[in-house]
Structure formats: structure tokens, C-alpha cells
Amino acid sequence: MPPLFHFVPSPMAGTVLYPLNELKQHEPEIWRREVAKYDGREQLLEMPIPPLGCLWNDVLHLSIVHPREIVAELEAAGVEPLRRRFLEFDAGVFDPERTVIFLNRPTDVAARSDDSQWLPFESANLDRLVELTEPTRRYNRECAMRRERPRLFAYLPHVFYRAALETRALPQLEV
């Protein structure tokens, strides 16, 4: 299975990554900073994730696409990427009952939770989703032309995990 990635929050309190709803209870100040990323997109926080029986803010969001590829694509589009550290997770340790793949295809927000957006968390599905998508490339170029900073994971597939994760012994990479 390919690895999964999550950027290291800055600052990160402790060594546990929490979904937003749990973070609010454990670290309210950090929660305020993290939830602010959804300004203007608040409806996402209540988006259902039917395969897991929960909401968008009840899960951790992990990238299937390697951060170096994302950074290289941003640079190719003419965007100076923010430099970040990422945690690297072994996808083989995730409980498939608590994990799902979200394809994140372009659509209106109301349709984002339709059945075609979800895949079971299986190695074969992960293996075919490690590349950047054409909608991501197009979005990055359009943002560059408008001189706007693109969202880092726009239109890229995500892995959603319904639990907190200990990060203490994980490898980190800087991109």
C-alpha cells in the first residue's frame, strides 16, 4: 500500500492528531485556528460521510498523493508553495472499518456525498489514486492566473479516518 500523508499542524500540541470535533474538546485554541480554514466553506463541516456514518469534521483527512508531487505541480503552475512538514503514515495499519477513500471529484457541494465519490479502503484503490488529477492541475493554473493561493488538496482524493492518530514515532518529511 502506498503511504498516506498529513501536514504537521503548526504549532502542534502534543503528539496526537484529532478530528476537528475531538480537537475542539482537547485543544480549543488550536481548533479555532483549524476551523478558520473553512471560512466561506462552512457547509463542508456538516457534510455527511455516509460510508462511515459521520460528518466531515469527525474524521482526519489524509492525502494519497505524495506532498512532493503536489509542491512540484504548484511550482509548475506558477504558484510559490508554502513549505510544510508532513507526517507519513503506513496505510497498512488503518482499520478499514474506520477508513474510506473520498475521490473529491469536482461537483456542487450538495452532490459531494453521492455514492460515486466513495471507495472502500483497499490497496488496489489506493494504488490507482497516487497521481495528481487533471482537475487539480487546472484549478492550480486558474488560481495562478488570478494570483490567488490555491487550496493545497483541491480535487485530490483523500483518505478519511474516523479516529485520532498517535504521531510520536512517525517519519516526517519537509517539502
Residue ranges and their predicted role:
Residues 1-175:
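Active-site-proximal loop/hinge segments that shape catalytic or ion-binding/gating pockets
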